[in-house]
Amino acid sequence: VLFSGSVRENILLGVHDLSSSEEADQRVRAALTIAACDFVDDLPEGVNTIIGEEGLSLSGGQRQRLSLARALAVRPSVLLLDDPFSALDVHTEEKIIEALRTGHEGLGGATTLLTAHRPSTVALADRVLLLEDGRITAQDTHTELMKLPQYRRLMSVQDEG
C-alpha cells in the first residue's frame, strides 16, 4: 500500500532511527536499489515525485517494488512478504532476491519469509516449506523437494496455472 505523498515520504514512513537528511537520502537510495526501483530516476521529480491519489499513478509492479523498499528502509531483522513478486517479471524478481541476500549499504540481509505461487520464485529460495492441510510436511531446498511426488505435482500444477 502506498500513500499520497512523495516517493521519499512513502519509503521513509515508519523509519525513526535517522539522524540527518543525508542519512535519510542514503537509506532511501539503498532501499530503492535493493527493491530494483530504478524507474524512480525517470519520474518527473525523482524521489520527490508525488504519487498516489493526488499525484502520479504507478503500475502494479512499481507499487510493489516501492512497498518493498519501504519495508527494507526500517532495517528489519525479519521480513515477512506475501507473494511480493506477483506483479514482476522473473528477471526483476531474481535481481531483487539476490539483492535481498547480499544487501546494500546496511540494508538487506534480513531473514526473509515469503509466500510464493510461481515455481520460479520457489526455486530461488534457500529453504522451502511444503504445506499440506495447514501443516508443514517437508522442508528442504527446491531441488531436494522435487524428489517428492506431491511437491513435483504441486510445482507442475503451478506451472500450468
PLM region descriptions:
Residues 17-33:
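Short coil-to-helix "N-cap" segments within the ABC nucleotide-binding domain's helical subdomain
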